A protein has these predicted regions:
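Asp-based, Mg2+/Mn2+-dependent phosphohydrolase catalytic module
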Residues: 1-185
Length: 185
């Protein structure tokens, strides 16, 4: 099994853009991937405002991010998820405030953007016919796989539950209670 995360995709996307300074609302893996890609993390005149997952978001971060975006920094989101397990605010919720204040929408690199699927397949030198996408969110993970023609696995240990499937026009290829129980990979 090979994994390609939204943090990896964000760094790969940004390597192809002009500018190497970023104001980051995020933690761990995202910051690590950005450093590996040669970015400087700063709150002085950044080229990008990058929003990922964090549990330490505060008003000062929102103010800085919105100010930088309103003044020309390119606004990037790792994903559009509004909340995660336990209903904690996620990237999409954090971006909503920045968007309202700055008047600019983020470019979403992660699922359901087709960009992450193409980048993942290229990075892994894989083909859609032999690739499975695993996720806990019908609106992002499973939608991305469906749109890319991939087999999909919905795990019920996160955002989406069995009842949610009936609300969508598409269906996952397989459904498992958790990642630990997947036996097709």
């Amino acid at each position: 099994s090979v994994f390609y995360t939204s943090a990896m995709a964000t760094a790969d996307f940004l390597k192809r853009q002009e500018g190497k300074k970023a104001y980051v609302v995020g933690e761990g893996a995202l910051i690590h991937e950005l450093y590996k890609a040669g970015f400087t993390i700063t709150d002085v005149n950044p080229d990008f405002v990058i929003v990922g997952e964090t549990r330490s978001f505060n008003w000062e971060m929102m103010h800085k991010a919105a100010y930088f975006v309103a003044n020309g920094a390119r606004f990037i989101a790792t994903n559009p998820d509004t909340h995660g397990r336990g209903f904690y605010p996620a990237c999409g919720a954090l971006c909503a405030g920045i968007e309202k204040i700055s008047g600019r929408k983020p470019f979403v690199v992660g699922k359901p953007s087709p960009w992450i699927i193409r980048a993942a397949l290229n990075t892994m030198q894989a083909h859609s016919e032999e690739t499975v996408i695993v996720g806990d969110n019908l609106r992002t993970d499973i939608l991305a796989g469906f749109q890319a023609g991939l087999e999909t696995i919905l795990v019920l240990s996160g955002v989406s539950q069995l009842d949610d499937i009936d609300t969508m026009p598409f269906r996952p290829s397989w459904i498992y209670p958790s990642v630990d129980e997947i036996d097709v990979i």
